[in-house]
C-alpha cells in the first residue's frame, strides 16, 4: 500500500475520538491500537452510522421496535382479560367462603350461581374451539349446541351482567387501594376520595420511578463501560510499571549482590562463633555440675602419678632398646646364643619343677 494511503497522527487521533464518542463496538481497544490501524477506526466510524448501540442495523431495530409495540399491545389486552377472569374467580371464591359462615340472600345466590354457570360454559366452549378447525373428535362427544343448552336464561344473564360490572369495579377498587397502601402506608388513614385521587396518579408515579430506574441502569451501564476502559488502560500502565520495576530490581540486585554476600558471610561467621561459644559454655556447665573441687584434686593426683609411671616406663623402654641395639651388633651368633640360653633356661625350669615335685613326695 502506498504511503499516501495512511492517515497522519492528527487525523488518526480525530478518528479515535469520534469512535470513542460513538462507543461502538463495545471492545477494549487502546489508543495505540486505533492509531496504528486508522482504516479500522474509519470502518468502525462508518459502521456506527448504520447500526445502533446494541449492534442491530437501523432497519432491523425499527422492525424490532414495531414488534415490541405489538407485543405490548397484545400483552395489555391479555392482561385485561386475565385480570377480569381472576377477579371473577375471586368473587366466586369469596362467595363460597362466605356461605360457610353466614346466610346469603336469594339475589346473591342467584347472581353467583348464574355467574359461575356462565363462566364454566364459556370456558368449556373455549376448550372445544371452532368446530370447523377440529380434525379429531370433540371431547366427550360434546358440541357447542350441547353447551348452549346449559347457558342461563337471557333475563338472568342480563341482570347478572349489570350487577357484575359493579362487583368488578368494587373489587378492583379494593385492590387499587391495597396497592396504594402497600406503596404508601400513610395513605391507609385517608378517605376514599383522597385514595381515589392518589390511585389515579399512582400509575404516573410508578412510570416515573420506572423511568428513573431505567435511567439509573443506563448510567450504570455507561459507568461500567467507562470502568472497563479505565481498567484496561490502568492494567496496561501497571504492566509497564511492573516491567520497569523488575528491570530496576535486577540492576540494583547485580550492584548490591556482592555486598549482600559479604554481609551474609560475616553474619554466618559470627553466628557460628556464637554457637561454638554456647556449646563450650554448656560443656563447662556440665563439667562443673559433674566434678567437685575434691574430685578434681584427686583426678589431678592420679594423672600426675600415671604420667610419672608412664615416664619411668618410657625410660626403661629406651634403656632396653639401647641394650637390644648393642646386642644386635653381634649378628647371628647372638641369635644362636639366645636360643641356646632359652633351651637351657627351659630345661633348668623343668628340672627345678621336677625336683620340687619329688621333694613334696618324700616329705
UniProtKB/Swiss-Prot annotation:
Location within or outside the cell: Cytoplasm, Cytoskeleton, Microtubule organizing center, Centrosome; Cytoplasm, Cytoskeleton, Spindle
Main location: cytoplasm
A Pfam short name: HAUS4
Any GO molecular function: microtubule minus-end binding
Disulphide-bonded residues: none
Keywords (A to Z) from UniProt: Cell cycle, Cell division, Cytoplasm, Cytoskeleton, Microtubule, Mitosis
GO BP: any one term: cell division
Family as reported in the entry's similarity comment: Belongs to the HAUS4 family.
The protein, known as: HAUS augmin-like complex subunit 4
